[in-house]
Regions:
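Acidic anion/phosphate-binding donor-loop and adjacent secondary structure
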Residues: 148-149, 195, 212-228
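Short hydrophobic beta-strand element within catalytic cores of glycosyltransferases
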Residues: 324-327, 334-338
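A short, well-ordered alpha-helix in the C-terminal region of glycosyltransferases
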Residues: 375-389, 399
Length: 406
């Protein structure tokens, strides 16, 4: 940690930023490490479970101080509280008096010159700051747009709840952005969308892109390869992600039920591996379909990526930049993605990855790659080169000191 000339930093995030093994933690982890290069950082965050709490030592090794609070708010009660108070339910779900008190204590006791809030649900912990203290709001994604998309065409109470959350959360996001010195989003596409709905300028709303750990996610790195039994002999298609997350669940369900039968008509021994922790019952049930494997949590996702003939990202709802796509491309694998999953990534379609508009086209593009080994190899090589050229974390986070210093 360096003391520099700006004082200290308070970093608030909705999950402990260790380990960097899921989308939100990958960004928060790398952002925290960048902040620690600038000044001492005090970290306030929540833990989803005992596993999260077990990383307190690792967080303590790089932070000046920390407050980790187990998160056990009921979704139902948070929803009712949000409705009663006119709050977004996402904010009510993460509300906690201990965090409010800790933030006030840190601001009073330490020479904090900048507060960085990560994700919309942490913004309400940031009080009105004294003159000279900067408030940087990293929204990451435009969450209100995600809930609006959930509610579109969805009837019944759940549809109403999602549409209401989209409206109320957008109002909250706009109010926070007006108060913050600067707000950041994971891609220029996401930042541009928020500028359009908020009326704020490029000076107030900027892109702060994700990167990828190029030395770690490299075909030349040292990692445990799949055994012949795990790999199998037929074509292997792989999806990676947190498997209790709705967009991921819907993506693998569509691919397993619609795309895989068409692929297996041409390749009866083709397999689709769904790789990621916390699969729901609905995801686990997909393993009963021909050629579908559900791995659950794996020690190292690189073994599955390296073994894949094609990595697929068939998301229908996606915000920001998909780390799963960056990681697969960094591993030099050919990727077939939906337009939604590729949005925000600075690549050329058909040169760095293939993009499909529906489940039928996803199957067709996978079959195209399986039939043309040279195309597959060229696509993977170009994908890796583009990640090296464009998405090194040191480059994507190079603007952070200016955001903090003003």
């Amino acid at each position: 940690m360096k003391s520099g000339g700006i004082g200290e930093i308070l970093f608030l995030c909705h999950r402990i930023p260790f380990p960097p093994d899921r989308g939100d933690k990958i960004r928060s982890h790398n952002l925290l490490r960048k902040l620690c290069e600038i000044a001492p950082v005090h970290v306030g965050c929540f833990a989803d479970d005992a596993r999260d709490m077990s990383f307190a030592t690792e967080l303590g090794d790089i932070s000046a101080s920390q407050k980790i609070i187990p998160r056990n708010n009921s979704r139902v009660l948070a929803g009712l509280k949000g409705l009663a108070n006119g709050q977004p339910m996402l904010v009510a779900l993460f509300d906690h008096p201990v965090m409010h008190n800790w933030v006030r204590e840190i601001l009073a006791a330490r020479p904090i010159s900048a507060v960085v809030a990560y994700s919309a649900q942490m913004a309400h912990f940031v009080p009105v700051l004294e003159e000279g203290k900067r408030f940087v709001m990293d929204f990451v994604d435009l969450d209100s747009a995600k809930y609006t998309a959930y509610g579109e065409g969805q009837g019944g109470p759940l549809g109403w709840i999602n549409r209401r959350e989209g409206r109320v959360l957008l109002d909250f996001e706009k109010a926070v952005a007006v108060r913050a010195n600067v707000s950041t989003f994971v891609s220029e596409a996401e930042a541009s969308l928020f500028r359009a709905v908020s009326g704020l300028s490029t000076g107030k709303v900027r892109a702060l892109e994700n990167g990828v750990a190029l030395d770690y996610f490299s075909p030349d790195a040292q990692f445990e390869r799949l055994s012949p039994e795990e790999r199998g002999t037929g074509p292997l298609l792989v999806f990676t992600g947190q498997m209790d997350y709705r967009p991921n669940i819907e993506a693998v369900d569509s691919f397993a039920r619609i795309s895989m039968p068409a692929i297996r008509d041409a390749h009866p021994d083709a397999r689709f591996a769904i790789v990621g922790r916390s699969p729901t019952a609905a995801v686990e049930a997909l393993a009963s379909l021909p050629g579908v494997t559900v791995t659950g949590a794996v020690a190292d996702v690189r073994g599955w990526l390296a073994a894949a003939d094609v990595v697929v990202a068939p998301l229908r709802i996606a915000r920001g930049i998909q780390n799963k796509v960056l990681e697969a491309m960094a591993m030099g694998r050919p990727v077939v993605a939906s337009a939604q999953a590729s949005e925000g990534i600075d690549v050329q379609w058909d040169r760095h990855l293939l993009v499909a508009s529906n489940a039928g086209q996803e199957a067709a593009l996978v079959l195209k790659l399986l039939a043309d080994k040279q195309l597959s190899a060229d696509l993977g090589k170009a994908a890796r080169a583009r990640m090296v050229e464009r998405y090194d974390w040191s480059a994507t986070l190079a603007g952070v000191p200016a955001l903090i210093g003003g």
